[in-house]
Amino acid sequence: AEDSVLFIRTWGAHWLIGTTDTPWDQGLDHPAASASDIEYLLRNVNRVLNVELGVEDIDGVYAGLRPLIKGKKGATSDLSREHAVENTVPGFTTIAGGKYTTYRVMAEDAVNAAIADLQGRGLIGTVPKSNTENIPLIGAIGLAEAQNQLQANAKNFGVRPQEVDHLLKRYGSMVGELMSILKYRPELVTPIAGQGAGGAGYLRVEALYAVTHEGALHIDDIVTRRTHLSIETSDQGLEAAEEVAQIMGAELGWDGQRIKRELTHYQDRVAAERDAHTAVDDSGAMLARNRVPDIRLTRV
């Protein structure tokens, strides 16, 4: 909507620009940005830039949906981003709305509501107050120590200074787990292919770590989820996918045919997303994107 908030934020070597904040009445599995969405953002961002941006300057595009609590009337940009919790029926607590950045208070409110429901029906006694606001994020405990150790030992692993910063930002104190892998797989210290000189600097060891520690099972899981290679590279991660497939295949026991199927699926996905970005409206974008269902829904 024209009255939506425009964000321009640095994102590593890129800018992150959004949002459109428009209603969506298509499927929920893979919301896709249309040419109209892209044109809208370019038109508005160029109002405040000295040098105009064009489609050719875009490396990646992605779309997502906000679970807004619907009002009786008004534009989506006017609707609240807050969440609401209700005990809709005995034993069933519902949470609606909200956003990623408030996930902890959302969870606390939902659990508190469920506890209140159970206590009100005499099913449980006193429950300690939630401590979630005091619990550090994963990788936060021991961060300073991990930073000192990595900086002191980086040369021993072949990790360059800029990669030290990259790994610490992504993994925090968990970075030691990646260093443990590099002890016996030193060849994985090199960057994943296709990132270019100004790329984010994802290392090959991160692809293996995504499989061994983060549950990655398909190329999509790494190129679009565990990393942002799909939106941070000019080819949407196609070159990176080739290398990721080899690393994953060696760890997961894929044969040549399985690697080929995984790569073909990712290549088809990128082609579908590119077509979606040239569609004039939401329905056309969804029609293009839905040509390639999620790989978990297909036989591999």
Residue ranges and their predicted role:
Residues A1, T10-H14, T20-V300:
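C-terminal accessory subdomains/tails of enzymes that are appended
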Residues L6:
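Dinucleotide-binding Rossmann-like beta1-alpha1 core, especially the glycine-rich loop
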